[in-house]
Amino acid sequence: STAAFGLALRAWNQGWPIGVFQFVKSAKWKVGEENALRVLGASGEGGSVDWHKMGEGWSWVQRDAQMDNEEKAREGWEQVKRDLAAETYKLYVLDEFAYPMHWGWVDTDEVVSVLRERPGTQHVVITGRNAPEKLVGLADLVTDMSKVKHPMDAGQKGQRGIEW
C-alpha cells in the first residue's frame, strides 16, 4: 500500500483523477494516507481523489462478518468495473485487492480479462500479498515488499504516524 500511495501522490501532482478502492480495511479505520489524499484531492491544485471503502475489515473468527465482506468485495469489484468502462479515473488504486482474489471472493480470470480489455490509458495498481499468478503475468510492474525487521516483532504496538 505504501508504494501505491506514493504513486498516487505523483499522479495527483500530474492532475490525474484518482479512484482509491480499499478492500479488507475497515471503513472505521482512520488512516493517514486517506486523510492526506482527501485534502490534496479537494485542494484544486492537482487531480481529484475519490475514496471508496469496501467492507468493514476482516475477522478470523466471525463467519457472518466474512460473508458480508465477501459480498462487499464483489460489490466493490462491480463498482471498479463500471468505473473502468466509463473511464472515470486515470489511476485506480485497488488497495488489498489481491486478498479477495486469493480467498476466492472475486474471480481472478474475470479480473484479468477486465484489466486486459479496459479502454483508454487507465492505470491500475493492486496491492496485497499472494497475488494470483495470472494477475502477476498480466502486470507491467510487480513489487514484492518483504519485512526484514519491524518494531512489532519485539512487541511494540502500532505507532501513530508510522502504521496509520
Model-derived segments and their meaning:
Residues 2-85:
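Conserved P-loop
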Residues 22, 53, 96, 128-129:
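Short secondary-structure boundary segments
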